[in-house]
Amino acid sequence: MRRHSSKSGVALPPVGQGPDACQMLTRAQLGQDPPQRTVLGVLTENEQYRRACGQEIATIRCFSGSENVFPAAGKKVLPDNGVSEPAKHGFDIYMDDPEQGDRDSCPGREGIVFEDVYEVDTSMLKSDLHFLLDFNTVSPMLVDSTAHAQSEEATDFGSDVINVTEYAEEIHRYLREAEVRHRPKAHYMRKQPDITEGMRAILVDWLVEVGEEYKLRTETLYLAVNFLDRFLSCMSVLRGKLQLVGTAAILLASKYEEIYPPDVDEFVYITDDTYTKRQLLRMEHLLLKVLAFDLTVPTTNQFLLQYLRRQGVCIRTENLAKYVAELSLLEADPFLKYLPSLVAAAAYCLANYIVNRHFWPETLAAFTGYSLNEIVPCLSELHKACLSIPHRPQQAIREKYKASKYLHVSLMEPPVVLPLQ
């Protein structure tokens, strides 16, 4: 991994080869203080958002190419139909041995050579693909401690289409059916040859930082992590390209969810130019193909907002529930084995107990069909995550919810023992 010369940055040394190559360095080994957060690049403000809010639109030009930026003078755009470019060596994708029950979770079809970002036959992907990438570029995991951004996220149930009162039960029923179809494999990390749970946690921690810097919605973060996990459930990725996959995931999620998504060039910049714009766009294209362009997925955040609307609580409990739910993103194991609706219910229960000394109201039990006994296993895991987060090196979520706009809920100490028996 590349070093960075910024005074405010912390760079991980190059990754070695051999049996210890998959081990992650902690901040203690690097001589860092625990409160500092891990970021994979230097971040900037969302200039596009300010331009769009502060200026009138003067001219609209039509062109083929990136939807975020106008093409530079003389730069090639997408070729016309029927005109192909010479084949170039790109990403090789190989077929894995199929497993029982895996066909529904990976929508691809056959092994292909991903030769050009614009020329791909979408009928050729197959389930259980392995993505074998060159290990010639390593992601720089850098910290920019000067970046202090606040999320614009504010609960506005009145404009949330998921919480339309007249159709709340039908919407919830549909989301419960959809979450089963779009869940990642619970233990996919066991089949990843070159990445670990710790590497994924560092990446998710960085995605939280990116979301805060560019003032992205919380739902954008949840979508990005969902895209990442579904992709890794089907593809084996070398660690040198893991950040590229994560960057493409949040780029795609921001295009889907945000009104003013950051430019592609911004996402290239936050990786410290480790990857080129072309590489990022190619990875975005591959991500779409592996996900079969299925981007509308239920998340824990959506279910939690439904529960908060159905059974209102004080603003402190609401913010604490959001904080607890977001902690579940850091760990693929054990939380991927629980459905998002169940994780949201556990987050609601834990926050409600910490603040109000009550767990699961009868109204939500009737609305969701979940009893407290069904929620207890996930609730126990979330409780452990809350107790351990002050001692973890990944502090982005905790720092985010230390802000006054969230009433400093991440500083609240949960009880050591929950009366669950």
UniProtKB/Swiss-Prot annotation:
One of its GO terms (molecular function) is cyclin-dependent protein serine/threonine kinase regulator activity. Polyubiquitinated via 'Lys-11'-linked ubiquitin by the anaphase-promoting complex (APC/C), leading to its degradation by the proteasome. Deubiquitinated and stabilized by USP37 enables entry into S phase. Ubiquitinated during the G1 phase by the SCF(FBXO31) complex, leading to its proteasomal degradation. Keywords: Cell cycle, Cell division, Cyclin, Mitosis, Nucleus, Ubl conjugation. It comes from the Eukaryota. GO terms for cellular component: cyclin A1-CDK2 complex; cyclin A2-CDK2 complex; cytoplasm; microtubule organizing center; nucleus. Coiled coil: none annotated. Gene3D superfamilies: Cyclin-like (1.10.472.10). PROSITE patterns: CYCLINS. One of its GO terms (biological process) is G1/S transition of mitotic cell cycle. Pfam families: Cyclin_C, Cyclin_N, Cyclin_N2. Residues 1-20 are annotated as: Disordered. InterPro entries: Cyclin (IPR039361), Cyclin-A_N (IPR032447), Cyclin-like_dom (IPR013763), Cyclin-like_sf (IPR036915), Cyclin_C-dom (IPR004367), Cyclin_N (IPR006671), Cyclins_cyclin-box (IPR048258). Belongs to the cyclin family. Cyclin AB subfamily. Interacts with the CDK2 and the CDC2 protein kinases to form a serine/threonine kinase holoenzyme complex. The cyclin subunit imparts substrate specificity to the complex. Does not bind CDK4 and CDK5 (in vitro). The cyclin A1-CDK2 complex interacts with transcription factor E2F-1 and RB proteins. Found in a complex with CDK2, CABLES1 and CCNE1. Interacts with INCA1 and KLHDC9. This is Cyclin-A1.
